[in-house]
Amino acid sequence: MSITGQPHVYKKDTIIRLKPLSLNSNNRSYVFSSSKGNIQNIINHLNNLNEIVGRSLLGIWKINSYFGLSKDPSESKSKNPSVFNTAKTIFKSGGVDYSSQLKEIKSLLEAQNTRIKSLEKAIQSLENKIEPEPLTKEEVKELKESINSIKEGLKNIIG
């Protein structure tokens, strides 16, 4: 069986194998919503599902690498050192001078705090762009009444 016959995700010339979802389970029947129930339609549905899962997985990797929770060498933003990677090296190093490492951690924390603050500002700007809720029935009724009173006033003035 070829590797593409198994669940997989492509990532920059790398094939990442996914575990099949139904291990050690009895045979299940799946219904696909298509006009013709042939093999090609089933393959198309599975490819769509594979693409959705793959895009979700790659998105999670991007978010994790952006915050430094995991290192993704293919992404430029994750090439920055991370607080979490430095913590690993501190515990491995043992009896080394910790003051230099503490300074490094402080700068890394400040860098990650600026990232978080910039994201908070972006979220705030998006919240400001969100339109308010639509008018309620009472507000529409009040607006109609005020427009009608303006019309009546204009009729009285004009004659």
Swiss-Prot record:
UniProt family annotation: Belongs to the caulimoviridae ORF II family.
Name of protein: Aphid transmission protein
Superkingdom to which the source organism belongs: Viruses
Described purpose of this protein according to its UniProt entry: This protein is involved in virus transmission.
Organism: Cauliflower mosaic virus (strain Strasbourg) (CaMV)
InterPro entries, A to Z: Caulimo_AT
